[in-house]
Amino acid sequence: MGKIFYIMGKSASGKDRIYSLLVENKELNLKKLILYTTRPIRAGEEEGVQYYFTDDRRLQAFEAAGKLIEARAYHTVHGIWTYFTADDGQVDLSEGNYLGIGTLESYEKLKAYYGAEYVIPIYIQVEDGERLQLSLIHISEPTRLA
C-alpha cells in the first residue's frame, strides 16, 4: 500500500517550493493530491494543477455524499473562501504514493480518514525572522522564489 506524504508549515516556510521540488523529482514517482477551493483562480494558475476550482454547490454535494474529508473556510475581504479535500477517486493507495500540502488541521482529518499508517506528516519549521524575510521577498519579487 502507498502512503500520502503531507507537507505542513507556517506561511512563508517554503512549503510550496519544497512541494514543487518533490513533485518534479521523477525518481520519487509521487502523485499529487490536489485540493479543492472555492476562491477564484489566480493569474498563472491552472485548473487541476494547483487546485480544483469549484463552488459551494460542489462542496455541499461532496458533504451530502459523505465524501468530504476536510474543509477550512477563510473570511477574506472578497468573501468566504473554502479549501477542502474530498474523496473524489484521485487517491488509490494501492497504486502508489501521493504528496499533499496543507495545514495541521487538514492533516489530522486526512489521518483520521485514511489511517495513521498511510498519512506521513512532513512539518517544515523555519525561524520567524527568516519567514518574514521570505514574505517580504515574495511580495516585492514574486518570481524570485519560484
Protein language model regions, located:
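ATP-dependent small-molecule kinase phosphotransfer cores
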Residues: 37-98, 102-104
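Hydrophobic anchor at the beta1->P-loop junction of P-loop NTPases
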Residues: 7
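The conserved Walker
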Residues: 10-11
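Single conserved hydrophobic/aromatic residue that forms the stacking wall/gate
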Residues: 137-146
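Conserved phosphate-donor/acceptor-positioning beta-strand/loop module used by diverse small-molecule
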Residues: 99-103, 114-135
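Post-Walker A helix-loop "phosphate-sensing" segment adjacent to the P-loop in P-loop NTPases
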Residues: 24-32
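Walker A/P-loop
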Residues: 16
